[in-house]
């Protein structure tokens, strides 16, 4: 009888579900944006004042999505003294996965389980479900949604999501100055201490080609021709084809060689258009479910930030629409001294002028700037960007002694390819514990590297770690044994 009643309550009772704890990991080294600007002959003010960039994190040669994610998850277990038996899910959002079949989440789970074994047993995470979720920068938002659904069905359990990524672009590209890296881990639970999340989500999805990481293909004959030229020899494509056809070992077998690199194929302007379009559609969808006006109802806005000022630059037109909808358009007209022109070109200049007004800047300072603070110092974290924005917002409020309980946070996630999700949450009474993570102190204590060192790292020419004495999980190498080739090994340093 009691069992039946319990099951009924699990599926029908309304309960608060959301973020109960947060933890993070950011690499110890960074490149000052000023150094990159000087090397690339870019005006520093355009990057710093225009895009909000100050520095960008990048992983050491012995760090990757698994080690960074495992460090964030272990930090979460330790800080919260989580009992592994209370955890039922480990979902990873990433676009820096290490394998096409083996989930990177299983590397993370195994590493964390090894460190918890002494207290909880060697199989303490054996009954935890783990999976990777990949949809460009929105994968961890998908993970959060699924984690909430799991906890709603299993209120006695917690779910952990982790976002871990490296944003790496080709040297000299327009994406180079937006690079970044790191991981954020989140515990999702009933009666959360930090933020309770609403049930409704606005979503918009459309297949786009704005940003992707394909498997590149090269014929071995092409590579052989290039190798011959490097050695000062001439070799025709026909001759190369004959040689590789009869070759053994590397040059034999398949005619085509497939490779993968972290640097994406991307179109910045197209991606920005897709971002704006999907967010607009997701906001409309959310509005059919929840009667809100973001300009009035969202105290803070946390969104995916490819660069720190993306939100403030993108949202100005949305903000103007919200002001028209909430009956405050006359305030805007008074600030500008005129209504928005009908002429498209004049209207564009009018909007640009409004974006620089004290009126809009006061909104940015209140709602958007707190999330920008960490992004400016770290760079783009792909899936972790939106959650680092949340962490930044809460830590900023804790530093300033701001009363956050009861405030509404609006979330806008985006992933190229493309998809956007819009949802909201309410800050709960225990939110201030996030201040104990000392995010901004940790970011101040990182080590800067010079541009030459950064280029060596980017081209994978560094042979030793930049920070050899770091604590936590690190990558130690690839196995060479038969049937284990390229399996990744890690170690832990206390």
Range-by-range predicted roles:
Residues 6-62, 176-277, 281-284, 418-494:
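Condensing-enzyme catalytic core mediating Claisen C-C bond formation in acyl metabolism
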Residues 19, 65-141, 294-318:
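Conserved beta-ketoacyl condensing-enzyme motif
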Residues 23-25, 93-99, 134-140, 163-168, ...:
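Acidic, glycine-rich active-site loops and adjacent beta-strand->loop/helix elements
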Residues 45-67, 97-158, 164, 322-385:
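Conserved catalytic cysteine-centered active-site region
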Residues 69-76, 108, 143-150, 282-286, ...:
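Buried hydrophobic packing segments
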Residues 72-88, 280-297, 316-321, 325, ...:
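Phosphate/pyrophosphate-binding loops at sites that engage ATP/ADP/AMP, CoA/4′-phosphopantetheine
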Residues 155-186, 191:
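Flexible, glycine-rich active-site loops centered on histidine and acidic residues
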Residues 344-353, 361-437, 441-444:
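C-terminal catalytic subdomain
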């Amino acid at each position: 009888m009691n069992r039946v009643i319990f099951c009924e309550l699990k599926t029908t009772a309304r309960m608060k579900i959301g973020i109960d704890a947060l933890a993070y990991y950011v690499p110890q080294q960074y490149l000052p944006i000023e150094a990159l600007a000087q090397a690339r002959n870019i005006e520093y003010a355009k990057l710093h004042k225009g895009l909000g960039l100050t520095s960008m994190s990048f992983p050491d040669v012995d760090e990757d999505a698994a080690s960074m994610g495992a460090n964030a998850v272990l930090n979460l277990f330790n800080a919260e003294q989580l009992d592994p038996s209370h955890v039922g899910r480990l979902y990873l959002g990433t676009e820096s996965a290490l394998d096409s079949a083996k989930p990177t989440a299983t590397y993370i789970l195994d590493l964390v389980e090894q460190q918890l074994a002494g207290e909880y047993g060697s199989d303490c995470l054996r009954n935890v479900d783990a999976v990777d979720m990949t949809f460009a920068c929105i994968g961890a938002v998908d993970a959060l949604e699924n984690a909430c659904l799991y906890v709603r069905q299993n209120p006695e359990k917690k779910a952990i999501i982790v976002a871990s990524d490296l944003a790496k672009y080709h040297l000299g590209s327009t994406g180079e100055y937006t690079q970044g890296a790191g991981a954020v881990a989140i515990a999702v639970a009933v009666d959360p201490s930090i933020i309770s999340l609403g049930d409704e989500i606005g979503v918009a999805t459309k297949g786009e080609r704005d940003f992707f990481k394909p498997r590149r293909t090269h014929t071995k004959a092409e590579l052989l021709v290039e190798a011959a030229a490097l050695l000062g020899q001439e070799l025709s494509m026909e001759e190369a084809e004959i040689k590789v056809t009869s070759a053994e070992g590397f040059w034999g077998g398949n005619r085509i060689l497939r490779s993968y690199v972290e640097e994406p194929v991307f179109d910045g302007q197209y991606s920005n258009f897709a971002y704006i379009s999907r967010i607009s559609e997701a906001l409309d969808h959310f509005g059919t479910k929840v009667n809100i006006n973001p300009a009035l109802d969202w105290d803070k806005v946390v969104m995916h930030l490819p660069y720190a000022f993306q939100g403030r630059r993108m949202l100005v037109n949305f903000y103007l629409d919200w002001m028209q909808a909430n009956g405050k358009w006359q305030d805007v007209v008074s600030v500008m001294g005129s209504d928005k022109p009908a002429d498209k070109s004049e209207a564009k200049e009018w909007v640009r002028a409004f974006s620089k007004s004290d009126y809009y800047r006061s909104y940015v300072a209140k709602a958007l700037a707190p999330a920008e603070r960490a992004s400016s110092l770290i760079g783009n974290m792909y899936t972790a960007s939106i959650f680092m924005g949340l962490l930044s917002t809460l830590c900023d409020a804790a530093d300033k002694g701001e009363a956050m309980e009861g405030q509404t946070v609006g979330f806008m996630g985006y992933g190229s390819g493309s998809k956007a999700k819009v949802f909201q949450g309410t800050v709960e009474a225990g939110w201030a514990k996030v201040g104990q993570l000392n995010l901004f102190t940790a970011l101040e204590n990182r080590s800067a590297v010079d541009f030459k060192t950064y280029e060596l790292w980017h081209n994978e020419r560094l042979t030793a770690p930049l920070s050899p004495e770091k604590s936590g999980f690190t990558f130690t190498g690839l196995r060479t044994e038969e049937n284990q080739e390229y399996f990744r090994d890690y170690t832990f340093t206390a």
